[in-house]
Amino acid sequence: MSPADLALLEPSLKRVALPLRMPLVTPDVPIEAVYFIEHGIASVVARTPTGQEAEIGFIGYEGMAGYSLVMDDDRSPLACYVQLEGEAMRIDAACFNAALAASPTLRLFLLRFVNYLQVQTGCTALVNARLRLAGRLARWLLMCDDRVVGIRFSITHEFLATMLGVRRPGVTVALQELEGLALIRSRRGEVVILDRPGLVALASGGYGVPEAEYSRLFGELDSAAQ
């Protein structure tokens, strides 16, 4: 983002905590604010009318929640909530829209992120259709690793099941498979990555395309850059 565009946003930005499960976007409700995530991870989630849900988008320090406003839409049918707690810079929707109106370059810059997220969502659809659960889990853990400082993070089997759109016993079996391959160590509520290259191999090409697109548009996607 250019210094001039950042200067448009800065007076209205406020640092806020992102507790676990905090809703950032509620489906079909006007978006109240945009969150530029600094630490933590948010999930973009699709829901059925009966309440079943699955993660279709994954946002960390590289992105923002409330991106529909960039496309001149004030709401989304998709939910977005915090899956790993952290912090964000929050700006009210009205102030954000005013900044977009004042600077065409700001909108163009943020549309790059929307493009990247579309690529990520497309790859999620591909791996959900073509990869075994263990490979899908490996990809998900790699995406977490890109956005979290350190090699361990707190996550429950139940939450992983929701994110991957599967039953909890399936997640347990997949975690055991990854642990048997010495790729991770799993304890109640915590996963530690032991062999990142091994996870990349198990993801069978499902990981890497969105990350390369992000690098092309913005630079390297790496938790060390936070």
Describe the role of every protein-language-model region.
Residues 22-84:
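Cyclic nucleotide-binding regulatory domains
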Residues 30, 127-131, 192:
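Conserved phosphate/pyrophosphate-binding and hydrolysis machinery centered on Walker-type P-loop NTPases
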Residues 1-35:
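Regulatory nucleotide-sensing modules
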Residues 1, 37, 59-60, 83, ...:
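A conserved hydrophobic position in a structured secondary element of the catalytic/binding core
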Residues 83-85, 100-168:
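Polybasic "coupling" helices that flank or enter modular domains
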Residues 57-115, 119, 123:
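Cyclic-nucleotide recognition modules
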Residues 143-226:
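Phosphate-/nucleic-acid-contacting segments
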Residues 4, 39, 94-95, 158, ...:
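Alpha-helix/helix-capping structural signal
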